[in-house]
Amino acid sequence: MPRSLKKGPFIDLHLLKKVEVAVEKNDRKPVKTWSRRSMILPQMVGLTIAVHNGRQHVPVLVNEDMVGHKLGEFAGTRTYRGHVADKKAKR
């Protein structure tokens, strides 16, 4: 269920401050964050945000289509290696 419009988007304050500093300085280095729950705002477009997936930081280049989504949607936490092949079926 989506968040109520009267509440507005959620973003952690520490991430918002990092984004504002990066925009001010025109910094191209990735902004490192553990906040997967924060929503992508229009001022983040063009920035690279390194989102933690539980093991490492995954670089996510934010574009206009991502606005309104959560950061965690773009950094998967599970690795799918496929189903194990049956040895009898190979013969």
From Swiss-Prot:
Keyword Heme part of the UniProt annotation: no
Keywords (A to Z) from UniProt: Ribonucleoprotein, Ribosomal protein, RNA-binding, rRNA-binding
BP terms from Gene Ontology: ribosomal small subunit assembly; translation
GO molecular function, a single term: structural constituent of ribosome
Cellular component GO terms, alphabetical: cytoplasm; small ribosomal subunit
Keyword Ribonucleoprotein tagged: yes
SUPFAM superfamilies linked: Ribosomal protein S19
Family named by the database record: Belongs to the universal ribosomal protein uS19 family.
Function: Protein S19 forms a complex with S13 that binds strongly to the 16S ribosomal RNA.
NCBIfam families hit by this protein: rpsS_bact (TIGR01050)
Protein name: Small ribosomal subunit protein uS19
